[in-house]
Amino acid sequence: MRPLTARQQEVLDLLKRHLETTGMPPTRAEISRELGFKSANAAEEHLKALSRKGAIEIIPGASRGIRILDNSSNDEFDGLPLVGRVRAGEPILAEQHIEATYRVDADMFKPQADFLLKVYGLSMKNVGILDGDLLAVHSTKDVRNGQIVVARIEDEVTVKRLEKKGSIIYLHAENEEFDPIVVNLEEQKNFEIEGIAVGIIRNNAWM
């Protein structure tokens, strides 16, 4: 089975839950209602995408004509955790920071992604990182000037372009409306580089 987008995984999970609780798959209208789609046509498009990726089989002519395919032999990855708010002094991948796990193959990114981070705001819009994107992050402390990094200051996580001059860190936005964040490592002890950006998922599509 080809990797699913976050939204496609939501639809597949709903199909499985419905089968477990009722013994039958949901209709397109039920999928739309439960997942907040505007119409049954939107549900149909997601089902077609799942079918193309080998997750389900659509049986023509039946409102509940959906069969989930057994892909257990092809399950070679566990997905990527989505990190939410973090607490100062705790590892970013601590269990209490994980909001969800998305069925995304870490090896699709180079270097390999270790977690996802939801982007808020438009401070990096000039390099195509937009509000609502899921940023794929490779965990590393080995970073170079000019790389887009995920940095943590106290309990705030930010995505910026790195510039280091001695003990001074400049975290540059890619939007002229935002000033750089300046960190003096001799004064700010609760500062960490958590990793580098290796890709994004936007609007439930691979970018």
UniProtKB/Swiss-Prot annotation:
Q: Which family does it belong to?
A: Belongs to the peptidase S24 family.
**What keywords appear on the UniProt entry?**
Autocatalytic cleavage, DNA damage, DNA repair, DNA replication, DNA-binding, Hydrolase, Repressor, SOS response, Transcription, Transcription regulation
Residues annotated as transmembrane: none
Q: Which reaction does it catalyse?
A: Hydrolysis of Ala-|-Gly bond in repressor LexA
- Which residues are listed under the site Cleavage? A88, G89
Give an example GO cellular component term for this record.
protein-DNA complex
Show the taxonomic lineage.
Bacteria, Pseudomonadati, Pseudomonadota, Gammaproteobacteria, Pasteurellales
DNA-binding region(s), residue ranges: 28-48
Q: Active-site positions, per UniProt?
A: S123 (for autocatalytic cleavage activity), K160 (for autocatalytic cleavage activity)
Query: What's the superkingdom here?
Result: Bacteria
Q: Which InterPro entries match?
A: LexA, LexA-like, LexA/Signal_pep-like_sf, LexA_DNA-bd_dom, LexA_repressor, Peptidase_S24_LexA, Peptidase_S24_S26A/B/C, WH-like_DNA-bd_sf
**SUPFAM superfamilies the record matches:** LexA/Signal peptidase, Winged helix' DNA-binding domain
CDD domains named in the record: S24_LexA-like
Give a GO molecular function annotation for the protein. Answer: serine-type endopeptidase activity
Write the protein's name. Answer: LexA repressor
Q: How would you summarize the oligomeric state and partners of this protein?
A: Homodimer.
The gene name on file is lexA
